[in-house]
């Protein structure tokens, strides 16, 4: 039986999440947004993924300091990190826990996305941001199969950070096989809006 028949309220909520999520993905990506808005978009994505994978497979917690909720951040930097966790970190049978944190630092803002998934080797981590790699870094699933694309998503987020915040800001990845992965986004100083294109 479909979700519409068995849980109509949940189905209605998911439809709203999907509509809002899809609308935002088509919006202007050249304009800064607030951290709160990024978190809302990330939450919509998580809600959709939880419905897809079933209750209990994804456990997500968010801890955003009140002082940084209105901070300006590059658009579409959180959802790709969450997607990476789900696509590349999940074990075959165990639930995946993801924790998102954001807080003010002496230099600006720090956002951390961490999971307790399968993790990565030092070799894979060392090559995540190499643009010249012809093939994406590999991540190995619990059944020994290979997943690709993790590095491309991270590289795109890094490029977006540099576009709005400059080279003084960036991203670091810490990971341990069998333990999990932590992605640290560092937004230092003040962002800048790129000049509009002229005809």
Residue ranges and their predicted role:
Residues 173-199:
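C-terminal end segment of the histidine kinase catalytic
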Residues 1-172, 182, 186:
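Two-component histidine phosphotransfer core
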């Amino acid at each position: 039986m479909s979700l519409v028949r068995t849980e109509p309220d949940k189905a209605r909520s998911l439809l709203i999440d999907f509509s809002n999520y899809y609308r935002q993905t088509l919006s202007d990506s050249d304009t800064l947004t607030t951290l709160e808005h990024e978190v809302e978009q990330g939450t919509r994505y998580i809600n959709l993924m939880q419905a897809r994978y079933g209750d209990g497979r994804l456990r997500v917690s968010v801890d955003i300091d009140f002082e940084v909720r209105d901070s300006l951040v590059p658009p579409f930097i959180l959802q790709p990190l969450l997607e990476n966790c789900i696509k590349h970190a999940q074990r075959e049978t165990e639930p995946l826990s993801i924790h998102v944190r954001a807080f003010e630092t002496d230099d600006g803002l720090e956002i951390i996305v961490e999971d307790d998934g399968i993790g990565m080797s030092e070799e894979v981590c060392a090559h995540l941001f190499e643009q010249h790699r012809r093939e994406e870094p590999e991540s190995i699933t619990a059944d020994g199969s290979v997943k690709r694309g993790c590095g491309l998503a991270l590289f795109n987020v890094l490029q977006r950070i540099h576009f709005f915040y400059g080279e003084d800001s960036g991203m670091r990845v810490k990971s341990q096989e069998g333990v999990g992965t932590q992605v640290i986004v560092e937004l230092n100083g003040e962002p800048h809006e790129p000049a509009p294109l002229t005809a």
